[in-house]
Amino acid sequence: MAGLMVSGTQVSYVGQSCREIPEHLGRDFGHFAKRLDLSFNLLRSLEGLSAFRSLEELILDNNLLGDDLVLPGLPHLHTLTLNKNQITDLEYLLDHLAEVTPSLEYLSLLGNVACPNELVNLEKDEEDYKRYRCFVLHKLPKLKFLDAQKVTRQEREEALVRGAFMKVVKPKASSEEEKAAAPENQPQYTPLPSGSRDLTSHRGVLGKGRYFYYGRNSEGNRFIRDDQL
């Protein structure tokens, strides 16, 4: 089937312009898939994801997922990337993730309004991003990596003391921003040709300090784990 790639326990359905998770994916692969990549689609809902109960990694970059995002209980999920979606309500998302993904250790939200950094919004600065990290770690203290940056001991300590006071206020969208967020005004990304895509490769978003790269051809945010350092 065009656009579908399966390698062991890894399933990739990238760049197919689907607005919902195809039923056949859950029926055919949900019982064994541990890594699912649905990036570069038009997803607004994750209905159907409940068929993938054994997921450990979920890549949802470059979709249209917003503040009504609902995930099923995924007790084994340790990696979640939601880069370049339409998420603005950080606190709601974090509370939801704390409830349904208790094993989560790697999270990336780059390219969402909920993740303030200068590459997305020139009105934000490094201090805004630090406060965001502090609040996220307060809500999800088990995280080891956030937005491709390793969580430091200092950040953990600060989150324990100050995290509850670092809430990032949800911005009010202007009419111009709402118009720009409409699907017809979203850029159309073209994924890598299937022949050049390797499901076992580790492409992704690398960050050092305050600067980030999240490319249009990224297959999903890949994190460097402790055993790779």
UniProtKB/Swiss-Prot annotation:
Keywords: Differentiation, Leucine-rich repeat, Repeat. LRR repeats lie at residues 32-53, 54-75, 76-97. GO terms for biological process: melanocyte differentiation. PROSITE patterns: LRR. The keyword Repeat applies. It comes from the Eukaryota. Coiled coil: none annotated. Residues 121-162 form the LRRCT domain. Residues 174-203 are annotated as: Disordered. InterPro entries: Leu-rich_rpt (IPR001611), LRMDA (IPR043313), LRR_dom_sf (IPR032675). Required for melanocyte differentiation. This is Leucine-rich melanocyte differentiation-associated protein. It comes from Mus musculus (Mouse).
